[in-house]
C-alpha cells in the first residue's frame, strides 16, 4: 500500500498555476453566459434582460467574495432575493452562469494536463469522440476465456464536501477552493442537485455540467487503484501502464488503441487474463480469470478501500459476482454472453475417417428487444406488447417534420446498435417506428393508414428510414487464425452521444 501511495503522490505533484484570478476574467463568464443562453430551462421569466445579465453576474461575483471575507452569511435565500437589488431578475439564471464559469475555470488544469500528455506523441485527434464510445473496444474484445465478472455499482459521495476535497490534490489554489465551498454551502438547493435512484444516482439538469465534472474527477481518483494493480501484474510495465491509463481517460485511450497501426499488439497487452475493466457512468464491469473465492476477496477489498481512503459508504450488495459462462452481461443496453458454438471436425487416420463433435466458446452481443420495446412504449410509439400506435402530440407538425423525427430516432437506435451482427431485432424496431409514423400522419389527415399509404405510398417512409448520413465510424478488424485475412468487420458509428435518445425533440 505504501508503493500505491507513492504512485498517487507522483501524479498529484504535477500541479498547475493558480486559477483564482480567472474567476474575475470577463471572457470566462462570456463563455459561460453563452452556454446558459443556449438553454431554455432558466429563461422562462419575461423579465430577463440579456444586456445587463453579464454585468450583474460580475457584480455578484465581487459581492460574494467581499461577503465571504467579511464572514457575512449572505446568498440566495428566498427572502433576500427581493431585498438585495444585485440579484437582478432571475437568481436561478445568475447562479447557473456562475456555476458554468466555475466549470470552465476548474477544467483548465485538466485540459493542460491532457495537452502535456499528448505533447511529442503522434496522435490522430478526433473531437467528436465521447466516453460512451469506449465500450466499443470492450465489446470487440474476446473475453470468453475469463471465468468471473464483478458487476459493480459505483458508490456516490453523500456530501459535496467530499467532491471539493478531492480537488485539493490537483488545484493548489486554496482561495478558489474556499470560494467554491462558500458558494456550495450557501446555495439553497444544493442538496437537491444529487437525485438518488434505486441503483445509482444522477444530477438534476440544473448546473449539471459542473457537478458531473466534480463527480467524474472523484471517480477517476479512486479508479487509480486499478492503475496500480495493473502495473504490478504485467512484465511490460511501460506499455501496460500507459494502455490502462487509456482506458480511464477516453481521449487518450481511443487515439492510442484505435488510430495506431499497433492496435492489435497493444490490445493484447491489456487483455492479460488477470484483469479486464470497463466503466461508464455509475457502473463498472471487472472480469478476471480468477476463481469465485478470489473475486469475493476483490469484492470486500473494494468496499473497504472506498470507505477507508475516500470516505465513500458502500455495501457489498452493490457488487455482484457472476460466472461468465452462465450469465448474460447487461451493460448500457448491450446484452452480451458466452455461448457454445457446436463444431464438427473431420479426422482422417489412414483409410478411416471420423467425425468428432466439439464446441467452441463465442462471445456474442445481442439486442435486448424487451427493454427496447419498453422504451418505445414509454415514449408512446407502441403499447407494452410492441403494437405500434400514433403519436398525437406530433400530429400538429408538418408532414416532413413528423417523418424526420421518426427517422432521426430510428437512426439513433440503429447507429447505437450498429455493431451487432444479427440485426433481426433492429428490423422489428424499424417496423414499429415506421408504422407509428404512418399512423401519426393518418391521424393528422383524418384518414386511415391504408388510405394514406395508397395516396402517398409507403415507399416514401422507406426512403426516409433507409437514408444514411455521412457519419464517422470505427471498424475493428479481426484476423483469421488460419489465413490471417480480415473478416467479420462490425461498424460502430461515432455520432451517438446518448443512449437511445427517443425523446430528443420533446
UniProtKB/Swiss-Prot annotation:
GO molecular function: RNA binding
This protein's record includes keyword NADP: no
Keywords: Chloroplast, mRNA processing, Plastid, RNA-binding, tRNA processing
GO CC list: chloroplast
Location (main, coarse): plastid
Listed InterPro entries: Domain_X, Maturase_MatK, Maturase_MatK_N
Single biological process term from Gene Ontology: RNA splicing
Family as reported in the entry's similarity comment: Belongs to the intron maturase 2 family. MatK subfamily.
PANTHER family, sorted: MATURASE K
Function: Usually encoded in the trnK tRNA gene intron. Probably assists in splicing its own and other chloroplast group II introns.
Protein name: Maturase K
Organism name: Erica tetralix (Cross-leaved heath)
Amino acid at each position: 500500500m505504501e508503493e500505491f501511495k507513492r504512485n498517487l503522490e507522483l501524479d498529484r505533484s504535477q500541479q498547475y498555476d493558480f486559477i483564482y484570478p480567472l474567476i474575475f476574467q470577463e471572457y470566462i463568464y462570456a463563455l459561460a453566459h453563452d452556454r446558459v443562453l443556449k438553454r431554455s430551462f432558466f429563461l422562462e421569466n419575461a423579465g430577463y434582460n440579456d444586456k445587463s445579465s453579464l454585468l450583474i453576474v460580475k457584480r455578484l461575483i465581487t459581492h460574494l467574495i467581499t461577503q465571504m471575507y467579511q464572514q457575512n452569511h449572505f446568498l440566495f435565500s428566498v427572502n433576500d432575493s427581493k431585498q438585495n437589488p444585485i440579484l437582478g431578475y432571475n437568481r436561478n439564471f445568475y447562479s447557473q452562469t456562475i456555476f458554468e464559469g466555475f466549470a470552465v475555470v476548474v477544467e483548465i488544469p485538466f485540459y493542460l494536463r491532457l495537452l502535456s500528455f499528448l505533447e511529442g506523441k503522434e496522435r490522430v485527434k478526433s473531437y467528436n469522440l465521447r466516453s460512451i464510445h469506449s465500450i466499443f473496444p470492450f465489446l470487440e474484445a474476446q473475453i470468453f476465456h475469463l471465468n468471473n465478472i464483478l458487476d459493480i455499482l459505483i458508490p456516490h459521495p453523500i456530501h459535496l464536501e467530499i467532491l471539493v476535497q478531492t480537488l485539493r490534490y490537483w488545484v493548489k489554489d486554496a482561495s478558489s477552493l474556499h470560494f467554491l465551498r462558500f458558494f456550495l454551502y450557501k446555495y439553497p438547493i444544493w442538496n437537491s442537485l444529487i437525485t438518488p435512484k434505486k441503483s445509482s444516482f444522477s444530477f438534476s439538469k440544473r448546473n449539471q455540467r459542473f457537478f458531473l465534472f466534480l463527480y467524474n474527477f472523484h471517480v477517476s481518483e479512486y479508479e487509480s487503484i486499478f492503475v496500480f494493480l495493473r502495473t504490478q501484474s504485467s512484465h511490460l510495465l511501460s506499455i501496460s501502464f500507459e494502455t490502462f491509463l487509456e482506458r480511464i481517460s477516453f481521449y487518450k485511450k481511443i487515439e492510442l488503441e484505435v488510430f495506431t497501426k499497433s492496435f492489435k499488439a497493444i490490445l493484447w497487452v491489456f487483455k492479460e487474463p488477470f484483469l479486464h475493466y470497463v466503466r461508464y457512468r455509475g457502473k463498472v464491469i471487472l472480469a478476471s480469470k480468477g476463481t469465485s473465492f478470489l473475486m469475493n476477496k476483490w469484492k470486500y477489498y473494494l468496499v473497504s478501500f472506498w470507505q477507508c481512503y475516500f470516505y465513500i459508504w458502500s455495501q457489498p450488495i452493490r457488487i455482484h459476482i457472476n460466472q461468465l459462462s452462465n450469465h448474460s452481461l447487461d451493460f448500457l443496453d448491450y446484452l452480451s454472453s458466452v455461448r457454445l458454438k457446436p463444431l464438427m471436425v473431420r479426422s482422417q487416420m489412414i483409410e478411416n475417417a471420423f467425425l468428432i463433435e466439439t464446441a467452441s466458446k463465442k462471445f456474442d452481443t445481442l439486442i435486448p428487444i424487451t427493454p427496447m420495446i419498453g422504451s418505445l412504449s414509454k415514449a408512446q410509439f407502441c403499447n407494452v406488447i410492441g403494437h405500434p400506435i400514433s403519436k398525437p402530440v406530433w400530429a400538429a407538425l408538418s408532414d416532413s417534420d413528423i417523418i424526420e423525427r421518426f427517422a432521426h430516432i430510428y437512426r439513433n437506435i440503429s447507429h447505437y446498435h450498429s455493431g451487432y451482427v444479427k440485426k433481426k431485432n433492429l428490423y422489428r424496431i424499424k417496423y414499429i417506428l415506421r408504422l407509428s409514423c404512418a399512423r401519426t400522419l393518418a391521424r393528422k389527415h383524418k384518414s386511415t393508414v391504408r388510405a394514406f399509404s395508397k395516396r402517398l405510398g409507403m415507399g416514401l417512409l422507406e426512403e426516409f428510414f433507409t437514408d444514411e448520413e455521412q457519419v464517422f465510424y470505427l471498424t475493428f478488424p479481426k484476423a483469421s487464425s488460419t489465413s490471417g485475412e480480415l473478416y467479420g468487420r462490425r461498424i460502430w458509428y461515432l455520432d451517438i452521444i446518448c443512449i437511445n435518445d427517443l425523446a430528443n425533440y420533446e
